[in-house]
A protein has these predicted regions:
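Short glycine-/aliphatic-rich beta-strand segments at the starts of folded cytosolic domains
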Residues: 1-22
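Helix N-cap motif at beta-to-alpha junctions
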Residues: 19, 56-60
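Ser/Thr-Pro-rich, acidic low-complexity intrinsically disordered regions of eukaryotic RNA-binding
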Residues: 22-28
Length: 80
């Protein structure tokens, strides 16, 4: 499972225990997310299982699929 740890427009941090110690899966996640030209940068940490995604909100929202993902993230962020 994936938890949405933090969100501000232009920056999303996710966590997944499945990524911890799994370099192959981390590479797959990095490759998939970074394949979208609307994404500025992706950092996947194999030690912590975190994924940091940076993007320009206006550009990202021109892609209908990514706009839906952002809406999902907003609805599922962990409230602290």
């Amino acid at each position: 499972s994936v938890q949405v740890s933090s969100y501000i427009p232009g920056r999303i941090r996710l966590y997944s225990k499945r990524l911890i110690g799994n370099a192959g899966l981390c590479r797959q996640v990095y490759t998939y997310i970074s394949s979208y030209h609307e994404i500025d940068s992706v950092e996947v940490n194999v030690v912590t299982g975190s994924v940091l995604i940076k993007y320009q909100p206006g550009l990202l929202r021109t892609n209908h699929e990514l706009a839906k993902v952002e809406q999902y993230v907003v609805k599922h962020i962990e409230r602290r």
